[in-house]
Amino acid sequence: MLLNKKNSPIILIGFMGTGKSTIGEYLSLEKQLSFIDLDVYIEIKENKTIPEIFEEVGEIGFRKIEYNYLTECTKKYDVIATGGGVIEYTESLNYLKQYKYIFWLDCDIDVIFKRVTNDKHRPNAIDKSKKQLNNLYLSRISRYNEIAFMKVNSDKTIREIYNEIINYLTCG
């Protein structure tokens, strides 16, 4: 199964640290699809890190920038790993609703906390307790659920997650 530009891209959503970038890259390599990590794309285009952008324009300013690049990437790439907060901006949330293959990667907050603690590239995780991260996570669940084609537990191996996604794409 190879996607072409006429097909809907595979879009990975979910909280920070759930494996969107890792799974997106693996999926693209296995299926010879084009892939982009939206945060990396933003950093390249803006010539700044995500934390620098947050510092300069705040979260709302960042979400507007993110939306502009999201609309660009959905037209250019087969597989897109979004930032965890892409659903926080109403325009991005509504834009994503038009796409069919949105996979919500999710895992236990303890796993997430271990993965993101002290990660300086995640401005919403810096100096946050597990309780604070959990509150942010809980505030986003309904939006992830609203647009997800399928929820995938990412507490598994990369290959198991990949197989589950491919199964949904080919059989579901």
Curated annotation (Swiss-Prot):
InterPro entries: P-loop_NTPase, Shikimate/glucono_kinase, Shikimate_kinase/TSH1, Shikimate_kinase_CS. Its main location: cytoplasm. Its EC number is 2.7.1.71. Mg(2+) binds at S21. It catalyses: shikimate + ATP = 3-phosphoshikimate + ADP + H(+). Keywords: Amino-acid biosynthesis, Aromatic amino acid biosynthesis, ATP-binding, Cytoplasm, Kinase, Magnesium, Metal-binding, Nucleotide-binding, Transferase. Binds 1 Mg(2+) ion per subunit. It is an enzyme of class 2 (transferase). Its cofactor is Mg(2+). One of its GO terms (biological process) is chorismate biosynthetic process. Substrate binds at D39, R63, G84, R140. GO terms for cellular component: cytosol. GO terms for molecular function: ATP binding; magnesium ion binding; shikimate kinase activity. It is found in: Cytoplasm. ATP binds at G17, T18, G19, K20, S21, T22, R122. Belongs to the shikimate kinase family. PANTHER family: SHIKIMATE KINASE, SHIKIMATE KINASE 1, CHLOROPLASTIC. Monomer. This is Shikimate kinase. The lineage of its organism: Bacteria, Bacillati, Bacillota, Bacilli, Bacillales.
